[in-house]
């Protein structure tokens, strides 16, 4: 334990908070280009084929990003928008691709939680809601 005199001379060192999403460089989103699009298997006890993409970002980093939702149209050279947010059962995946922006199309036939998956409001549902 330091003496009062030592604290006066040196002071306490502040604990720096380490970023969970360093590739974003403090920005909320970052644009990037897909280099590889593939499926990976999750950690135990889960079992699936999770869709991920390796993305080269404008910040210079190359990161692995999760592709949310059912089905996607991404391939090599697709331009995508990345946000922070890890996938708990995929080690090393700390970013999500934003659906409905750039080359990542929204999820088809999605009715609920549409804003999270980049899906526009369905036309026929809007008309029937107006009649009732």
Curated annotation (Swiss-Prot):
CDD domains: Ribosomal_S12
Keyword presence, Acetylation: no
Gene Ontology BP terms: translation
Tagged with keyword rRNA-binding: yes
Any GO MF annotation of the entry: tRNA binding
PTM annotation, UniProt: The methythiolated Asp-89 contacts a modifed residue of the 16S rRNA close to the decoding center, and might be important for decoding center assembly.
Disordered: region residues: 106-132
Keywords: Methylation, Ribonucleoprotein, Ribosomal protein, RNA-binding, rRNA-binding, tRNA-binding
GO CC annotations, alphabetized: small ribosomal subunit
SUPFAM superfamilies in the record: Nucleic acid-binding proteins
Feature: compositional bias, Basic residues: 109-120
Modified residue annotations for 3-methylthioaspartic acid: 89
Function of the molecule: With S4 and S5 plays an important role in translational accuracy. Interacts with and stabilizes bases of the 16S rRNA that are involved in tRNA selection in the A site and with the mRNA backbone. Located at the interface of the 30S and 50S subunits, it traverses the body of the 30S subunit contacting proteins on the other side and probably holding the rRNA structure together. The combined cluster of proteins S8, S12 and S17 appears to hold together the shoulder and platform of the 30S subunit.
Recorded family membership: Belongs to the universal ribosomal protein uS12 family.
HAMAP family linked to this entry: Ribosomal_uS12_B
NCBIfam families: rpsL_bact
Protein name: Small ribosomal subunit protein uS12
Organism field: Thermus thermophilus (strain ATCC 27634 / DSM 579 / HB8)
Gene for this chain: rpsL
């Amino acid at each position: 334990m330091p003496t009062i005199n030592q604290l006066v001379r040196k002071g306490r060192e502040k604990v720096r908070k380490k970023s969970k999403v360093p590739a974003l460089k403090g920005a909320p989103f970052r644009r990037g280009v897909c280099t590889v699009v593939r499926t990976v298997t999750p950690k135990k006890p889960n079992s699936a084929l999770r869709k991920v993409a390796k993305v080269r970002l404008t910040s210079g980093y190359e990161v692995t990003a999760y592709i949310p939702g059912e089905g996607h149209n991404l391939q090599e050279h697709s331009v995508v928008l990345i946000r922070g947010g890890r996938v708990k059962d995929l080690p090393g995946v700390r970013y999500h691709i934003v659906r409905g922006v750039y080359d990542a199309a929204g999820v088809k036939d999605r009715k609920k939680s549409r804003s999270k998956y980049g899906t526009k409001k369905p036309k026929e549902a809007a008309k029937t809601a107006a009649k009732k």
